[in-house]
């Protein structure tokens, strides 16, 4: 049952990003991004990462919802563009969904998809399971590895969020 829930959540996750990338009005784009954040956190929670899923959901909705609200207030339109308002937007959405269906059918037929990258030297990231109960939880080990080995990922993520806010403010300033 959990495999089906994870599969449905991952399909909804990708379809929501296809819906965002088909360039609807900013009001609907922000709504779809919030929904995709919820689906992504549901995927994390379905794999057993309740703490990490909750933290991502709170940070995502707490931080980025302010940006979505501000940009939609600055870029409101009298007649907002929805997915069915023009043939180009609807075609982009349908094409993205069809590409996702083709990928799912390909994976279903072949049983697996090869990984593009070779992951070597990940011994510090791997969590060994001895079959019993231990002192450390797997997600606590992952969070500590993120803050120790992945400090540059945190810095780049924070910087890119800051630059994203500045770009959004600059785009909506002239509107």
UniProtKB/Swiss-Prot annotation:
Q: What coarse category fits the chief subcellular location reported for this protein? A: mitochondrion
Q: Which EC class heads this enzyme's classification? A: translocase
Q: Which PANTHER family match?
A: NADH UBIQUINONE OXIDOREDUCTASE SUBUNIT ND6, NADH-UBIQUINONE OXIDOREDUCTASE CHAIN 6
Q: Where in the cell is it found?
A: Mitochondrion inner membrane
Q: What does this protein do?
A: Core subunit of the mitochondrial membrane respiratory chain NADH dehydrogenase (Complex I) which catalyzes electron transfer from NADH through the respiratory chain, using ubiquinone as an electron acceptor. Essential for the catalytic activity and assembly of complex I.
In which domain of life is the source organism classified? Eukaryota
Q: Which InterPro entries match?
A: ComplexI_Subunit6, NADH_UbQ/plastoQ_OxRdtase_su6, Nuo/plastoQ_OxRdtase_6_NuoJ
State how it assembles.
Answer: Core subunit of respiratory chain NADH dehydrogenase (Complex I) which is composed of 45 different subunits.
The processes (GO biological process) annotated in the record are: mitochondrial electron transport, NADH to ubiquinone; mitochondrial respiratory chain complex I assembly
**Source organism (scientific name):** Ceratotherium simum (White rhinoceros)
Lineage of producing organism? Eukaryota, Metazoa, Chordata, Craniata, Vertebrata
Reaction(s) catalyzed by this protein?
A: a ubiquinone + NADH + 5 H(+)(in) = a ubiquinol + NAD(+) + 4 H(+)(out)
Please provide the record's keywords in A-Z order. Electron transport, Membrane, Mitochondrion, Mitochondrion inner membrane, NAD, Respiratory chain, Translocase, Transmembrane, Transmembrane helix, Transport, Ubiquinone
Name the chain's protein: NADH-ubiquinone oxidoreductase chain 6
Kindly give the membrane topology term recorded for this protein.
Answer: Multi-pass membrane protein
TM region positions: 1-21, 25-45, 47-67, 87-107, 116-136, 149-169
Q: Which GO terms describe its cellular component?
A: mitochondrial inner membrane
Enzyme Commission number(s) from the entry: 7.1.1.2
Which cystines does this chain contain?
none
Can you provide one Gene Ontology molecular function annotated for this UniProt record? NADH dehydrogenase (ubiquinone) activity
**Which Gene3D superfamilies does the UniProt record give?**
NADH-ubiquinone/plastoquinone oxidoreductase chain 6, subunit NuoJ
Any Pfam family the entry gives: Oxidored_q3
User: Which family, according to the similarity comment?
Assistant: Belongs to the complex I subunit 6 family.
